[in-house]
Design a protein with these regions (language model features):
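C-terminal catalytic/acceptor-binding lobe
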Residues: 9-12, 16, 212-342
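Well-ordered, non-membrane alpha-helical segments in soluble/globular domains
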Residues: 10-20, 49-65, 106-114, 139-147, ...
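Active-site-proximal specificity loops/subdomain of glycosyltransferases
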Residues: 37-121
Length: 342
């Protein structure tokens, strides 16, 4: 299991790591936590304009490494290696001769995903983001997913069901999104073969990647993305890692099978917002998810919604005009620093 995280995940990390170890610890050979130590300059992934909170959180995080490694078997922390030599190794494996950028056009994580996956050094890599939650708690899902990838040569990825199962199928943002997936079947139960993959959670067949794909293409972001990236001081070479991997599936006719598996199965849940009230409620929320105490309104939806936790306060803070204001502040901060440096 390979978990991507960064210092600003600190408020929830211990609770979500313990949850992941209960869900997957007995199903995997080892667990690598990949910590991105390079803060983005702008966008929704940054900490604050001077990166003070980011670096302070990193020092606190580093103090946790030995504590958590002593608590769990076969757990290790690895900070993302941005050295020129390691970047060449990662670039050669995933891109061939092209150099991999540190960040995506929007300042989001990019290189850290691929460096972590490669460092896992396994034929099958179970990758996930640090904040993901899981219900069903099947202890056989990983073995079933590997068997499925071995059986179906039209798949590059397998993933848990996106959201708790609903008799009417997928809901939330997937409701009616017929372009994104085809309904399928795994061991007699409904499954969904997606033409997309989320970097939040997947099991990847590394041998099939090299045999069927070889290397990834870095499709140039569209002009509006490149302009925004330039204005905010981000690299403009790559779309998000998720988009790059999804376009790869489509180009090569491969898929990502989302399925629950045997028994109570396994499904994923994604928290759309992070803030103190949510982090305070997280231990109780994790307990509910693990016990299967899920309201009907949450079923079929992969994002935690208000039926399970009330995010209305945070949604108001993420209103469009406030997001635009934050981007303008990012722009002013970045170019003020550039002008001072010159």
């Amino acid at each position: 299991m390979q978990i991507n995280t960064y210092p600003l995940d600190l408020p929830h990390f211990e609770a979500t790591l313990a949850h992941k170890m209960r869900a997957f610890g007995s199903q995997v050979d080892r667990t690598i936590v990949t910590v991105d130590v390079r803060p983005p300059q702008s966008g929704r992934y940054k900490g604050d304009p001077k990166a003070n909170r980011y670096m302070q959180s990193l020092e606190t995080f580093r103090a946790l490494y030995p504590v958590l490694e002593s608590q769990y078997d076969n757990l290790s922390f690895h900070e993302v290696d941005y050295s020129a030599a390691e970047k060449r190794v990662v670039s050669d494996y995933f891109l061939g001769s092209e150099e991999m950028p540190d960040k995506a056009w929007d300042g989001g994580p990019f290189y850290c995903y691929f460096q972590g996956i490669l460092e896992a050094d396994s034929d099958y890599v179970l990758h996930m983001d640090a904040d993901m939650l899981y219900g069903g708690m099947s202890q056989t899902w990983v073995d079933e997913a590997i068997a499925l990838l071995q059986e179906r040569d039209d798949l590059l990825f397998a993933s848990p069901l996106p959201g708790p199962p609903h008799p009417g199928g997928l809901k939330g943002k997937h409701d009616g999104a017929d372009h994104a997936f085809d309904e399928d079947e795994v061991d007699g139960r409904v499954a969904y073969r997606f033409h997309f993959v989320s970097t939040r959670i997947f099991l990847m067949d590394m041998k099939r990647f090299k045999e069927r794909v070889g290397t990834l293409d870095l499709d140039t972001p569209r002009l509006s993305y490149r302009l925004r990236g330039l204005l905010l001081g981000n690299p403009i070479k790559a779309l998000s890692a998720e988009q790059v991997l999804s376009l790869t599936l489509q180009k090569h006719g491969l898929g990502n099978m989302c399925f629950a598996g045997a028994g109570d199965g396994l499904y994923s849940l994604h928290p759309p917002f992070h803030y103190p009230a949510f982090h305070a409620a997280l231990p109780g929320l994790i307990d509910r998810v693990e016990r299967g105490d899920i309201p009907d309104g949450q079923r079929g939806d992969y994002d935690i919604n208000d039926s399970l936790f009330d995010f209305s306060e945070m949604r108001q803070n993420h209103a469009r005009h406030k997001r635009v204001t934050r981007r303008l502040m990012d722009f002013v901060t970045y170019w003020s620093a550039r002008l001072k440096a010159s």
